[in-house]
Amino acid sequence: AFARVCALLLLLMACLAGWPAWAAGSAKEVVTTPHVRAELVAHAPDGVSPGATVWVGLQLAHQPEWHTYWKNSGDSGQPTQLQWTLPAGVTAGDIAWPLPKKIPIGTLANYGFEGTVLLPVPLTITPAFKVPLLSGDIEVKLKAAWLVCKRECIPEEGEFALKIPVKGSTALNASAFQAALDAQPKAVAGAAGATPGSSVTIDGTAIKLKVAG
């Protein structure tokens, strides 16, 4: 009987040893493929509190000669897609897309990113947000899908999870977020005599004209 109990205990210990990896699934901060290193990062220098805006983002580091796509991919391609799972009282905005570069593929003109790019997303902390009593962190989960191309294109995806302290500062990637936000398309200052409400915006290689009235 004692030997049987010992055997059962050993079996239970073996099962428990494998439990964390199985229970946590595949979600993590970094996903690496042969073509891209993708990382979920955050910027919350003042912590997390109702009324605040916290920034998160997917940072893609491409292998040489590989690229992913902008929101307007051009003649071909598909933009990176982000699907968030957030705590109650936290809502995600749209990607604040930085300006892309023109990537010619044969006779096609595409718009996307090479090297390293950060796709920032604002999280709004609404009055409905309740501070977690036990952990002191909020958990941000992301399922992302991207099309990475050289000459051929390969669809890839990853599941990410990141904890952000409610109190305290998360600012390790401050410079990367600032650079990405600075690289957004800028509105051109209105010319003298322009109709109020009219605007001109440079978006990639396109000039968008909005005329009021």
Where are these regions (language model features)?
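Bacterial N-terminal signal peptides
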Residues: 6-18
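N-terminal secretory signal peptides that target proteins for export/translocation
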Residues: 1-4
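Extracellular/lumen-exposed scaffold segments
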Residues: 20-213
